[in-house]
Amino acid sequence: MMNNKDAIYIAGCGGMLGEAFYKVFENSYHLKCTDISVNEKWISSLDFRDYDEYRRDVKEFKPNYLVHLGAHTDLEYCETNQEDTYITNTLAVENAVYITNELKIPIIYISTAGIFDGKKDTYDDWDIPN
């Protein structure tokens, strides 16, 4: 029973940002927090890079919002593992958008523009980083 609380699905919740989201929202919302690495009792195992599993899990939970936090952030890892980084940081985000469009719910996505020079208002996957 959700006690009339909105439901939020948080993908990629195993890091510091995910824990901060959990602490802020745990008492006000019905949460499902997932990550590939389960390091807390409130996190369920899910690899959001697997579109079918991600879609199924989100649809079963029936959230009002989807928060997608997961990404590779270690620049050295990203440079040496470009295919995995692309799958994780780009394709999985696109899949999250497809899922939210299908369910007609908002997506909340947090990323960084810290690798760019700040001269443009918006950036895309093809902009050259610093």
Give residue spans per PLM region.
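N-terminal Rossmann NAD(P)H-binding glycine-rich loop of SDR-like oxidoreductase domains
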Residues: M2-S28
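Helix C-cap/helix->beta junction micro-motif
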Residues: Y29, F61, I99-L103
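NAD(P)-cofactor binding segment of oxidoreductase domains
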Residues: T80-I108
